[in-house]
Design a protein with these regions (language model features):
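Conserved glycine-rich cofactor-binding loop
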Residues: 12-13
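Rossmann-fold cofactor-recognition segment
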Residues: 47-62
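Amphipathic alpha-helical dimer-interface segment in Rossmann-like NAD(P)H-dependent oxidoreductases
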Residues: 69-73, 104-125, 160-161, 229
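Conserved NAD(P)H cofactor-binding loop of Rossmann-fold oxidoreductase domains
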Residues: 82-88, 245
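Catalytic Tyr-X3-Lys loop
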Residues: 85, 92-112, 128, 145, ...
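Catalytic loop of short-chain dehydrogenase/reductase
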Residues: 126-165, 176-178
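Short, small/polar-rich loop/turn modules that mediate ligand/substrate recognition or access, typified
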Residues: 164, 169, 235-237
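Short C-terminal tail/terminal secondary-structure segment
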Residues: 231-250
């Protein structure tokens, strides 16, 4: 059986390396994309020769050619858009331009990624974007995550309809809040506004879960790897909510 490729954008982030490791375990070669070439080489040293580093800024159109040129001469089974956003604060203090920047990274970046691999996609290839809880449950403390991830949910549905005739499926994975450095920055903004200690606010956020837990990177990687199964066709265009029981809406 010939080898195939997965492309993971944001591979040096909180989720990216864990996802890449899981996809390598599933037998795929992985092209890992990030801006920082030095950090990419560190990841490559940990993941081995089936990991192919690609230094590119997914917020810029030049990433399309950079990713395309890094692809091995084989089919692309999956792309994963796992780009993180800088914390810009709540909606009362965030710079207006930060909202546009978030949309460029989340939505523009996903479009660039898919266009880079379009000619290598095959039947049942998976186009996966990582959104987040705040795209569905708005918080005044997470302006960029809320706006960027809400827009991404719409884009994934558009991708689903656009690529469906080719039997290629698009998926949104919406974790969180996840136990990462970024979440601590969100908690710090909430704590400052509420006049509470950071640790107290962090535990309050944990208690928002029905099971008193934050989502972990390993759980996100598990869900994404599951989408490689042929049965995942049934999830075309849908959102996998990995929020550890936080959502209240029906």
């Amino acid at each position: 059986m010939s080898r195939e490729t997965a492309v993971v954008v944001g591979v040096t982030g909180a989720f990216g390396e864990v996802i890449a490791k899981r996809l390598l375990w599933r037998g795929l070669d992985v092209v890992g994309v990030a801006r920082d070439a030095a950090k990419l080489e560190e990841v490559a040293g940990r993941l081995g020769q089936e990991f192919i580093p690609c230094a590119a800024d997914i917020g810029d159109d030049g990433a399309i050619a950079a990713i395309a040129s890094a692809l091995p001469d084989q089919a692309v089974a999956m792309v994963v858009h796992s780009v993180g956003l800088p914390v810009a604060g709540g909606i009362l203090v965030a710079e207006p331009g930060a909202l546009a920047a978030a949309t460029n990274l989340k939505c523009g970046g996903f479009v660039r990624l898919v266009r880079a691999v379009d000619t290598r996609l095959r039947d049942k290839s998976r186009l996966v974007a990582i959104g987040g809880h705040y795209g569905f449950e708005p918080s005044p403390y997470a302006a960029t995550a809320g706006v960027g991830n809400a827009a991404l949910a719409n884009l994934v549905r558009q991708m689903s309809w656009a690529y469906g005739p080719r039997k290629i499926t698009a998926h949104l994975v919406a974790p969180g809040p996840a136990d990462t450095d970024r979440l601590r920055k969100v908690a710090a903004a909430r704590a400052e506004r509420a006049g509470k200690p950071l640790d107290e606010e962090y535990e309050n956020m944990r208690a928002d879960s029905a099971i008193g837990a934050f989502t972990t990177p390993d759980q996100v990687a598990w869900a994404i790897a599951m989408l490689l199964d042929p049965e995942a066709d049934a999830l075309a265009g849908s959102t996998m909510g990995l929020d550890s029981g936080r959502r209240h809406g029906i």
